[in-house]
């Protein structure tokens, strides 16, 4: 279980997250929605330990990770996988080397054991036989799948996805959504997905949370979220722009 308790992230007078509270159950897929700059990606960085909150607690499996040293957190981080928005593959490494990276750093497995796991994970994401390819030989969707294969190499109990369908065509985006759902079912892991893709959100989520101005204004099951009476939820679902004053040259 993951719990965020009164989490604040602020830079001088700018508040990114404002006393955020949230509980994520084991095995749940939670989708986090919100406008640009609402703090979605900041939340992921906090959970995976790439950033520390200004105040508050982040409890992962009963441990407040905000109190851990970097060495202590590395042990926790081995149970986590992350799929970054732009895949974040190592350009100088082959596909197989990218997927094997965490296994070589964090385990004492033999080369044969690592080779077996790499082949298996690539098979899970539909890229069997791609070990020798270089990242620059892959499409955007294939890079995302390699990133996912790398994220699941260590059998994580938690996978974080930062805009997994960003920059992808609708068909490829649908493939990524199916893989997200498939990994949750295969591994029984907890998944946190940050996305702007409503179709993907509704497909993969058990619950959906909407961040607005540093606070969660809605956290509910997918069907309840769709039918929420909150006008900001409906505005986000239907992509309705807020009215703004536009000054033209003629108006000046």
Specify the residue positions occupied by each region the protein language model found.
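Catalytic Walker B motif of ABC-type/P-loop ATPase nucleotide-binding domains
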Residues: 159-162
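Helix-to-loop junction immediately C-terminal to a conserved catalytic motif
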Residues: 48
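Helix N-cap at the start of a conserved alpha-helix in ABC-type nucleotide-binding domains
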Residues: 170-172
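A short, proline-enriched helix->beta-strand linker immediately N-terminal to the Walker B motif
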Residues: 153-157
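Conserved ABC ATPase signature
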Residues: 134-138, 142
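Conserved ABC ATPase "signature" region
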Residues: 63-64, 111-129
């Amino acid at each position: 279980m993951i719990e965020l308790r009164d989490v604040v992230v602020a830079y001088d007078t700018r508040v990114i997250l404002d006393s955020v509270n949230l509980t994520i159950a084991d095995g749940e897929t939670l989708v986090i929605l919100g406008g640009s700059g609402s703090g979605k990606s900041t939340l992921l960085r906090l959970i995976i330990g790439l950033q520390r909150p200004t105040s508050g607690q982040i409890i992962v499996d009963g441990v407040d990770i905000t109190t851990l040293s970097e060495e202590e957190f590395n042990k926790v981080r081995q149970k986590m996988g992350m799929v970054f928005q732009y895949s974040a593959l190592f350009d100088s490494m082959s596909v197989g080397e990218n997927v094997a990276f965490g296994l070589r750093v964090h385990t004492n497995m033999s080369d044969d054991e690592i080779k077996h796991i790499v082949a298996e994970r690539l098979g899970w994401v539909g890229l069997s036989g791609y070990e020798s390819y270089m990242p620059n030989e892959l499409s955007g969707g294939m890079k995302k799948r390699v990133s996912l294969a790398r994220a699941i190499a260590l059998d994580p109990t938690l996978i974080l996805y930062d805009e997994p369908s960003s920059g992808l065509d609708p068909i490829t985006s649908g493939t990524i959504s199916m893989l997200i759902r498939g990994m949750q079912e295969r591994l029984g892991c907890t998944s946190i997905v940050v996305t702007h893709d409503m179709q993907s959100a509704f497909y993969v989520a058990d619950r959906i949370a909407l961040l607005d101005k540093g606070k969660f204004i809605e956290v509910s099951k997918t069907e309840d979220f769709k039918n929420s009476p909150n006008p900001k939820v409906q505005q986000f679902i239907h992509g309705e722009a807020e009215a703004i004053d536009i000054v033209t040259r003629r108006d000046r």
